[in-house]
Amino acid sequence: MSQALGAYRNGLRAARVAFKGDLRMLMAARQQMRESMVNPPNPELPPDQQIKLMNDVAQFLRQNVVQGKRTKDDKYHLNIHKDTELGDNETIKTTKKTLAAQGGGCCGGGAGLYK
């Protein structure tokens, strides 16, 4: 039971970091976590896997959710914090053969583009 409580608290702390300054989203995330603890979405999972799922959600919130706020000049200020995962985008630069248009794309003009 203490592991479940620890995972729940971990989720609440992660939501506080991810949704800092956005009270509406913070309250919605807290309500969703509370509901998921009382009525698990996958009740057939063993408790240890449900605890792992809650910890994974907390990790995802900390590392991958970034709040943005529109500024006066139609730009966005992102709330990037110390736990935000910043990738180097190297995987984006490499083209995957499965995603390349084999037949030349929808209009036929891309034949030989990704070779």
From Swiss-Prot:
InterPro entries: Complex1_LYR_LYRM7, MZM1/LYRM7. This is Mitochondrial zinc maintenance protein 1, mitochondrial. Belongs to the complex I LYR family. MZM1 subfamily. One of its GO terms (biological process) is mitochondrial respiratory chain complex III assembly. The gene is MZM1. It comes from the Eukaryota. Residues 1-35 form a transit peptide. Assembly factor required for Rieske Fe-S protein RIP1 incorporation into the cytochrome b-c1 (CIII) complex. Functions as a chaperone, binding to this subunit within the mitochondrial matrix and stabilizing it prior to its translocation and insertion into the late CIII dimeric intermediate within the mitochondrial inner membrane. Modulates the mitochondrial matrix zinc pool. GO terms for cellular component: mitochondrial matrix. It is found in: Mitochondrion matrix. Interacts with RIP1. It comes from Kluyveromyces lactis (strain ATCC 8585 / CBS 2359 / DSM 70799 / NBRC 1267 / NRRL Y-1140 / WM37). Keywords: Chaperone, Mitochondrion, Transit peptide. CDD domains: Complex1_LYR_LYRM7. GO terms for molecular function: protein folding chaperone.
